Amino acid sequence: MIVKLYENNTNPQQVRKVVELLRDGGIIIFPTDTVYAFGCDIFKPSAVEKIARYKEKDARRSDLSFICQDLSQISEYARMNDEAFKLMRKNLPGPFTFLLQGSHRLPKLFKNKKVVGIRMPDNNIALELVRELGNPLMVSSIFTDDDTLEYLTDPEL
């Protein structure tokens, strides 16, 4: 299924359709503020494991990141001190991944990770999907060492 969402005008009905797919354990490809990424609901282990297989990685050991909608949601899934909070408040949303200690709210699949990558991209589509879903998305760029970056950042190619 192809659903077109536009950053300057995300259609709520289309967003709900994508979120329904995520809740059913589906995987999406969507834009962030840097590259296109695979995404899934962090509470759907089979979807997380599928993305890890696409990337030829072990889901329990690989460096997969989460996209959160705001600092409040970040604080639910990761521990941050005052310094980290101030740095994040100053730089997010933006093209950064912050490496933080995970909290007790992480899904079982991620419990053994000491550090998780947390993102809040400057991209309305990504943030709207997370808002509607109600919890973070697990994401991994579709970029591999063999890919041309332009191909992954230009949806017309």
Regions found by a protein language model. Give the residues of each.
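Active-site-adjacent structural elements in enzyme catalytic cores
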Residues: 1-157
